[in-house]
Amino acid sequence: MFIFDCEVFAYDWLFVFKDVETGEYTIIHNDNEAVKQFMARSPILGGFNNKHYDNHILKAVLCDADPKQVKEINDFIILKGHNGWENEFLSQYRVYFESFDLMDDCLVGLSLKAIEAHLGIPIEESEVDFDIDRPLTEEELSSTIFYCKYDVDATELLLRLRKIYLQNKMNLGRECGLSASKALYMTNAKLTAAYLKAEQRPHGDEREYQYPKQLLRQYIPDEVFHFFDRLQDLSIPDEEVFSESLDIMVGECPCTIAYGGIHGAIPCYSEETSKDRTIRNKDVASYYPHLMTLMGYCSRNIPSPEVYAETIERRVAAKKAHDGETADALKLVLNTTYGAMLNQYNDLYDPLMGRSVCISGQLFLLELAEHLILECPTLKVIQLNTDGIMVSLDYTDEPKYQEITEEWQVRTGFELEEDFIRKIVQKDVNNYVEVPMKGDPKIKGGLLVRGVLTNTKFELSKFGLRDWPQLKGGAFKINNNANIVAKAIVDRLAYGTPVEQTINDCNEIFEFQMIAKAGGKYSHSFHLVNGEQVPVQKVNRVYAAPFSVEHGCPYGTLYKTHAMKGSTSKISGLPEHCIVDNNNQLTIEAVDKTWYIRLARKYVNDFLGRKGLKRNTRRVNSLKKKCLTLL
């Protein structure tokens, strides 16, 4: 297995291949025959975004394209935004090699440079201009090789971090008779379809949804049925009906019903368990998989519903037998099937069944919530989401609460898993801190969740990394942006610790890093230093810089320039004064902790619903002008 990357210029192209086992590099520059000889070894190639880019450049070289043609294909993909297989030169040839893309099943928009930055390693970008209209000098070529090797090393690091994910794919491939390389090449959705032996069939009944007979309709407001009945009105275009939503109140909880599920939470709400009152959360175990099997919503493209039901049973058996490999591989199937049923390019595509899972799922939970509100006078719905409900109630209502939830389980066949909550603090449905009676707080939301998704517990120091928090989940994601602020918010909301204490007690500089990314639509970035525009990379690690009225600060913020429009704008989310440190040379003494304290306080107030005093911007600006006139 080799990790590879390529670079393309007007008169030069370069490939770097790294043997994962030996660590040996193979570097090839402008030599088509050398590439052919290397590929004759039938290597399995791994890269990042190689399906979209590097594979097509490699194919061009294997088809004897000269540097000019390779550059044209590069521009066809990068500048013009086309797919490589649409290129006229490439479409003439049939070239096959085994590869996989570590960008598959990643969070959309995540770049390799951003991953490097969030991992805390130096962010290295090539200083050689890709628009050079002449052959590279020896110095430029040497520099390009260095940076290309650096990206290959970073991709190899990502390979090791995603070891569990890749192993699950290979195990699942083995289950359905696929080679390891074939399984790695496929996305989770494609691999799931292959495992379930799905064969795409035409379906023209996406809007013929039927309400499940197990539903107690009397507890659900009529307006909800009116909303979903619009499916039957074919005069309403698909794009209109499926983009609609309905806002309702479930007790005191504002909820939104839509074709992506139900979501609701009392905004800026907090509550603690007391001697008279309890907070409970009930999630439906494997809700969407069981909707498919119990309600008959499996894709009609698989041989029979029993195939999917057997997968659930096999996973349960594997977990009981402590067969982690099989259990994790089958979990991939269960977590991926629903989304694949709504993907028109997947063999599981069956939109009626996909819509039915989502609609019935929210109706059953809405029915439960409304029933509880009706018969438990002290009960309050705190949260209602796609697979669970959180409530608080007096202990006097608990017998009725348990009676209703038990009846719901028996009637529907679903299983509710209950958690006892000590404290809940939520900003909205997507941002909350939930403190259980036992264990660490459960957190959700972009303001709070930090770390790298590994789905296991690695010793990250073995990879030369600091001990970042490790997450579990689906698509690969990483976010180590201003971690200290997230920690300060959680400590304050969960335990009452002042944000000043959490932040001032921390002297680990990486906890304060912020990753400034310009984005693909921008040609370059610059840093304002002493009023001058200093060019910087498109992805940068920055820290808040100290500022005083007496001494000021030489450092401004970072800006980005739009590639097409030429317009300049600030990179959002950064301090007015910040320092760039892509090579990790700064110490904590250079960081302005007060900026992070102010930010943490603001977010805590957002959670608690405390609105800060609004500044009269017009009056402030007017006073500024008057002062300047006097000077």
Please name every model-derived segment:
Residues 1-16, 23:
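Entry/capping segment at the start of metal-dependent catalytic domains
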Residues 1-8, 99-101, 280-282:
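Two-metal-ion RNase H-like nuclease active-site motif
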Residues 4-6, 28-29, 47-50, 282, ...:
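Short His-Asn-centered micro-motif
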Residues 15, 52-64, 285-299:
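Short active-site loop/helix that positions an aromatic residue
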Residues 21-114, 147:
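Conserved DEDDh/DEDDy metal-dependent 3′-5′ exonuclease domain
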Residues 106-111, 127-137, 251-375, 392:
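Helical catalytic core of nucleic-acid polymerases
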Residues 118-126, 132-286, 290, 368-409, ...:
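Conserved "right-hand" nucleotidyltransferase catalytic core of DNA-directed polymerases
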Residues 398-631:
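C-terminal, non-catalytic extensions of nucleic-acid polymerases
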